[in-house]
Amino acid sequence: HNQPVGTWSDDTSMALATCDSIRATGRVDMRDMRERFVRWYREGAYTVSGLFDIGGTTADALSSGCGRAGERDNGNGSLMRILPLAFTDATDDEVRAVSAITHAHTISCEACVRMVHVARRLAAGEGPHDVAGSLTGVPESEVRSGGFVLSTERAALWCLANTSSYAECVLAAVNL
């Protein structure tokens, strides 16, 4: 996308909007989050220098005001921005509702719930291998990294299960 060093992604911008909404409202408020997502989309809020990338499902949902629920609307957009909810008392239903602002299909919503649970377990002191152990030793060649939410979820868990440090995990994720 030919962006300057230090520019963060659309997913990070939406995660920042999520954090800002929780900070401002003191709770998980889907209407406020959606409004902040729309400000990001239309005005470049939460960016370094304006919007430069957006997934099709996210763009359609923010333009229409309705989360996309088709089988082909299971991109990884909501999964990539859901982490802030792990550090709140958000219920599984609230996690699903936050996903559904843009990605309303059950596959996307449930992937978000699972990832919030993973992050909460890690924050509670469980080790990465305990949380994602079923993927320990799976060859990298069997891990697909792409835009589909389940591929992204599996890739993230594979990185946790097959690395031993933060730096190694991030590098593995980048190189998938």
Predicted features, each with a name:
Residues H1-L176:
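Structured, active/binding-site neighborhoods that engage oxygen-rich ligands
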